[in-house]
């Protein structure tokens, strides 16, 4: 396994940092449960902040134990099943971005991009299936690829945030859209400081050991009230630069080989399980053997500049009226350079084969070493084996605008009216340039997987640090423009009768969501070989079988002028860079440490094509949604047999109308025609919910039970009439405007034992019955004479049930002697298991789990705190999970088990200034993905360790 093969140096350096962190200071974090603070409506049955008392006073994070005690009090009073994390001082989250902070919550797992937390899965639900709100307003997606609903948490500044909540049981007043749950991001407010002026800031630097760079980050926030605390203003801003470098050893997919030719076959001719007479079966056990498809190395470099601004004005002209207006603007600008060395082994499906004499079968029907050899007559031609140097260059510009206006009017002591109007816009521009240089017509390529990491070690008959053998150069520019907007308004009414019904609430909401995506294409190609021209010599069958032929055959179809032009473009402009590949520990990797880097200078020298006259009609589309909802709910409290019982009962009705717009292509070749396409849809959902709580032992033992129905809408790109093709892998994808939403019934039953002010133990059983979801299927389509494997989304036909248990605890060791009394532990564990998901491994027929679901996940944090010093060490781990049932080559894609150590320490110089040191991924954990086998790795990724240091100050 990856974790057992880390180098001694990696452990030693990580241990040194961890040791320092264990002698220096303050995480200030807590897991809590509480009601949403104003200005968003407070859920029924949840404790509301008292008038004039800031919500922050409920769970103040001035010390670990005090914050935990306050957290338990809020959780005890809450009507819903939820967890939260809060912070008093600027930047004092347990982790360095909002996504990473959420991974400490029971039942939450995160996805990472370049080692940073970027997406949040709740109880196995994919990040795109969970709703994210900022002060009750929808946070839209800024994905730069195909449009999704998954929120990019890296662009939400943690310094703006007062509290994060993960709501796992819905109430009728909540906006629908969270299949797993809803993440509430609640920002600081002008009246949080009891009318006193507030000013805080931080300055820090971060060192990323792969990039070997120091980057800055600054934050400032201030608030003040005026006119005898009737008017409050808060302004805040952040700025940061971030250098992310992460290395990947990839294998794009795994395929079987036809032994009659013997050449690579897209999936042999096996329908699913076993082999027929055409499939290579080295050990003759009746099962086809797996060979790698497009092994490659990738060095990813990202330089990101982020800045954000937040402004809030609150006005309280009279005691019973509160008005507000707020706005947030965030922007992240990335410069990208992803440097590839990859093999075109898919081309071997027609122009190459496998030398069985130089191939070794390893475990699980998977080759551990393979030699690909050129087919007869293809050495020195455009159709032979190839090695490709590829760089994805360009910029990604993400922008998010959130604005909201609203108010709360207490008409009387019993009747309240609340109204909100909001506008949100998310924009992502991916100005991508793909520069590719290929060395074609190679005699052989060796790939070895016998190292402990499972990463491919590639051996070429050419030197990858030179321009030797380059015969083709392509520059492809494909800018994509994604836009999402939401216009929303709602009004809520609440009446508080004097009876066992403590609250009756009803209201309406309207949301218009518009998503568009435009893709442009522009390509410039230099071909030094004429495709299909045979070489001057024939390769004998004996040489073909052993791979001993040499690449010294000159193609009669070569164009010397173009070959020289390619060299003139590449030679003066390429560089190897100063980065050694996979340099955080070998992990058994001894492949190429450097290879050609085709940077922007190479693309410019080739003449970067202007794509804007070439709109791609089949991947330019729009999806519009009109949602109108109404709800009614009631909160109640009574005492049967002396046991206090309270809860919230309600129902929500939503009507959704959709329209998918785009283009379709009919005919092929010169007869192809592009026509506009539009499809409308409509559905209405009825979503009942009940949340119950019983106080079995006063103030000590509580029982909770919930039953709710929830929905989540498919990704806009799945609903779009879009169609894309990959001419390298002979694959493609389509959208499906007829998709229905995800639908599920959810149940919770839990016990919470409040042992003392800070000590706590809980266990919650949950069940999710998913009656409708989106799955993937494939079909073969003949397009322009070529057979493509097309993937398209469909509604799953099975009924899936997920059962799980969440266990959480907090223990303060204040009963121990000496300094041990200042220590404590927080921990949680989640177990989840599904049944009914009917997708199988295409090749083995084995059962697959529901996508995104880890069976086990664990979070453990230990802390020490006194009046000056505070430290925390945390470990987060999740077991393997399914990413996609049908990935490249019909293989499943599986995320392997992953665990990571983080730590933080701080020292309070005085009441106003503190210094801190924090480390992320202290022991260089590697992330891996595979094709449902540890011996068929798809991705082995290393992103190194990040160290933060800085100072915080407040007045």
Spans of model-derived segments:
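Extracytoplasmic beta-strand/coil segments of soluble accessory domains associated
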Residues: 99-141, 168
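Flexible glycine-rich, low-complexity coil/linker segments exposed to the extracellular/periplasmic environment
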Residues: 260-292, 354-385, 446-472, 530-619, ...
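Outer-membrane beta-barrel signature, preferentially recognizing the C-terminal barrel domain
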Residues: 398-400, 619, 623-625, 711-770, ...
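Gram-negative outer-membrane beta-barrel transporters
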Residues: 767-769, 781, 786-885, 923
């Amino acid at each position: 396994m990856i974790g057992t093969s880390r180098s001694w140096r990696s452990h030693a350096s990580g241990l040194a940092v961890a040791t320092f962190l264990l002698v220096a200071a303050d995480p200030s974090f807590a897991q809590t449960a509480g009601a949403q603070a104003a200005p968003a409506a407070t859920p029924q049955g949840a404790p509301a902040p008292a008038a004039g008392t800031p919500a922050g006073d409920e769970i103040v994070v001035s010390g670990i134990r005090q914050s935990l005690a306050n957290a338990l009090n809020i959780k005890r009073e809450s009507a819903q099943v939820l967890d939260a994390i809060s912070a008093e001082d600027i930047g004092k989250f347990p982790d360095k971005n909002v996504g990473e902070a959420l991974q400490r919550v029971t039942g939450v797992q995160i996805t990472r991009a370049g080692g940073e937390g970027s997406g949040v899965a709740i109880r196995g639900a994919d990040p795109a299936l969970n709703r994210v709100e900022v002060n009750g307003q929808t946070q839209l997606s800024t994905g730069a690829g195909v449009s999704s609903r998954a929120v990019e948490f890296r662009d939400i500044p943690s310094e703006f945030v007062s509290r994060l909540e993960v709501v796992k049981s819905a109430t009728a007043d909540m906006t629908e859209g969270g299949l797993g749950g809803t993440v509430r991001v609640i920002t600081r407010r002008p009246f949080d400081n009891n009318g006193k002026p507030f000013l805080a800031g931080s300055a820090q630097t971060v060192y990323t050991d792969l990039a070997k760079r120091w980057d800055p980050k600054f934050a400032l926030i201030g608030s003040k009230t005026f006119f005898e605390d009737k008017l409050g203003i808060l302004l805040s801003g952040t700025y940061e630069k971030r250098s992310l470098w992460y290395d990947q050893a990839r294998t794009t997919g795994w395929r079987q080989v036809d032994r009659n030719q013997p050449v690579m076959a897209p999936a042999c001719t096996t329908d699913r399980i076993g082999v027929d007479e055409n499939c290579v079966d080295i050990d003759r056990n009746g099962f086809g053997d797996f060979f790698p498809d497009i092994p490659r190395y990738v060095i990813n470099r990202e330089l990101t500049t982020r800045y954000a601004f937040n402004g809030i004005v609150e006005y309280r002209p009279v005691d019973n009226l509160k008005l507000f207006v707020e706005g947030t603007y965030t922007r992240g600008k990335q410069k990208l350079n992803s440097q590839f060395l990859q093999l075109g082994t898919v081309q071997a499906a027609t122009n190459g084969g496998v030398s069985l004499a130089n191939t070794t079968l390893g475990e699980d029907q998977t080759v551990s070493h393979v030699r690909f050899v050129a087919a007869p007559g293809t050495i020195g031609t455009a159709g032979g084996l190839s090695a490709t140097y590829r760089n994805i260059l360009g910029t990604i510009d993400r922008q998010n605008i959130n604005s909201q206006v609203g108010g709360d009017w207490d008409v009387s002591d019993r009747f309240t009216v609340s109204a909100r109007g909001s506008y949100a816009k998310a924009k992502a521009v991916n100005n991508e340039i793909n520069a590719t240089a290929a060395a074609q017509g190679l005699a052989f390529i060796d790939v070895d997987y016998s190292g402990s990491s499972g990463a491919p070690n590639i051996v070429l008959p050419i030197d990858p640090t030179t321009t030797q053998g380059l015969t083709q150069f392509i520059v492809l520019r494909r800018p994509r423009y994604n836009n999402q907007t939401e216009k929303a308004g709602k009004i809520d009414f609440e009446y508080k009768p004097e009876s066992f019904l403590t609250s009756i609430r009803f209201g309406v909401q309207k949301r218009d969501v518009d998503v568009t995506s435009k893709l442009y294409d522009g390509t410039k190609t230099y071909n030094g070989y004429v495709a299909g021209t045979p070489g001057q010599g024939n390769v004998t069958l004996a040489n073909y079988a052993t791979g001993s032929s040499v690449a010294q055959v000159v193609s009669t179809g070569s164009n010397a002028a173009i070959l020289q032009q390619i060299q003139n473009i590449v030679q003066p402009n390429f560089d190897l860079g100063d980065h050694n590949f996979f340099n955080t520990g070998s992990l058994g990797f001894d492949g190429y440490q450097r290879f050609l880097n085709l940077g922007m200078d190479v693309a410019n020298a080739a003449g970067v094509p202007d794509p804007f006259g070439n709109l791609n009609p089949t991947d330019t589309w729009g999806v519009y949604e009109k949602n109108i909802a109404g709800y009614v709910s009631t909160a109640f409290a009574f005492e049967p047999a002396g046991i206090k019982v309270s809860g919230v009962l309600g129902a929500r009705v939503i009507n959704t109308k959709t329209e998918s717009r785009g283009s379709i292509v009919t005919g092929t070749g010169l007869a192809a025609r592009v026509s506009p396409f539009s499809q409308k849809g409509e559905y209405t959902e009825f979503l009942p919910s009940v949340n119950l709580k019983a106080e079995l032992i006063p103030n000590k033992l509580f029982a909770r039970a919930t039953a709710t129905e929830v929905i989540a809408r498919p990704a806009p790109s799945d609903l779009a009439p879009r169609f894309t093709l990959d001419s390298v892998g002979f694959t493609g994808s389509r959208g499906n405007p007829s998709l229905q939403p995800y639908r599920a019934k959810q149940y919770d039953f839990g016990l919470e034992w409040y042992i003392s002010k800070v000590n706590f133990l809980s266990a919650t059983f949950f069940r999710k019955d998913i009656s409708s979801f989106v799955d993937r299927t494939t079909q073969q389509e003949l397009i322009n004479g070529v057979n493509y494997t097309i993937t398209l989304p469909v509604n799953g036909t099975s009924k899936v049930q997920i059962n799980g248990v969440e266990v959480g605890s907090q223990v303060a060791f204040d009963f121990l002697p000496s300094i041990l009394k200042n220590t404590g532990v927080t921990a949680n564990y989640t177990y989840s298991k599904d049944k009914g998901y009917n997708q199988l491994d295409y090749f083995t027929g084995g059962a697959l789990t529901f996508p995104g679901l880890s069976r086990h996940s664990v979070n453990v944090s230990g802390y020490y705190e006194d009046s000056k010093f505070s430290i925390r060490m945390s470990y987060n781990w999740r077991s393997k999970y399914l990413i996609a049932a049908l990935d490249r080559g019909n293989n499943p894609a599986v995320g392997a088990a992953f665990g990571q150590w983080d730590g933080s320490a701080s020292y309070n110089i005085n009441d106003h200034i503190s210094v801190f040191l924090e480390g992320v991924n202290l022991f260089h954990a590697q992330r891996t993905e595979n094709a449902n086998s540890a011996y068929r790795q798809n991705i082995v990724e290393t992103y190194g360790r990040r160290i933060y240091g800085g100072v915080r100050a407040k007045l």
